Amino acid sequence: MINTCALKNYLEKSQKKESPAKETIVTSLNRSLSTPPSHLEGILLINKPKGKTSFSLVRDLRKRLGVKKIGHAGTLDPFATGVMVMLVGRNYTRLSDQFLLSDKEYIAEAYLGVVTDSYDCEGQVLSQSNIIPTLEQIKEAFSLFQGKIEQVPPMFSAKKQQGKKLYELARQGIVVERQPVKISIHTELLSYNYPYLNFRIECSKGTYIRSIAYDLGTKLGCGAHLSNLTRTRSGAFCLENCLNGAEIHTVTNLEQNLIRND
């Protein structure tokens, strides 16, 4: 567990993989923290448990710490787990846009042969297939998901089009054409035991892992959806440094786990 420490020093000395946005974050911290932070300001690293929403973590922390200004540096769907960078206090919530620029790493599981409208396990089934790809076909498909590529955002996403969020249109049964977005990714096949396909992915801001699973299924000709997801890193912050989000209410001296730029 990371004890209370200077955030800038933590980012600079971290031996974990560095985020491309690290220097930007440190610079913004120096500009933003013109006044000394209170003892209830800083960054709290939480391992979000399955079933909880990102907002529910914010709500729990507001109640536990008695601090109204709490945000995060990237949401996770309810079925997903892993690193949530919680920003506590005004001096840190104002930096959320900078933290959102950080690259991220995930361990993902795709379920082959079933396509859903949301591209994940929470959606309605649209189609099924009995095609069973070979390991060689899997490896060939993964070779196409490396480096700089273009990705079409899913309909069930918060991106706006026609003045509305895409998921609002999707819930009305409206499907609109979406423009592809340039992203940078590196994928690594971990295991394949049909219908389960497990892989690691490092990606730039704005990457939809659900779309990666969907696009993999399309390339393989069998269809697929994202069935499990764990965020293992967000910028310089790693899963092993996170508090268990299911134990927020029972952790003693929770404020001592705040990472600060003292």
Swiss-Prot record:
It catalyses: uridine(55) in tRNA = pseudouridine(55) in tRNA. SUPFAM superfamilies: Pseudouridine synthase (SSF55120). Responsible for synthesis of pseudouridine from uracil-55 in the psi GC loop of transfer RNAs. One of its GO terms (molecular function) is tRNA pseudouridine(55) synthase activity. This is tRNA pseudouridine synthase B. Its EC number is 5.4.99.25. The gene is truB. NCBIfam families: TruB. The keyword Isomerase applies. Belongs to the pseudouridine synthase TruB family. Type 1 subfamily. Keywords: Isomerase, tRNA processing. One of its GO terms (biological process) is tRNA pseudouridine synthesis. The keyword Transmembrane helix does not apply. The active site is at D77. It holds the Pfam family TruB_N. InterPro entries: PsdUridine_synth_cat_dom_sf (IPR020103), PsdUridine_synth_N (IPR002501), tRNA_psdUridine_synth_TruB (IPR014780), TruB_C (IPR032819). It comes from Protochlamydia amoebophila (strain UWE25).
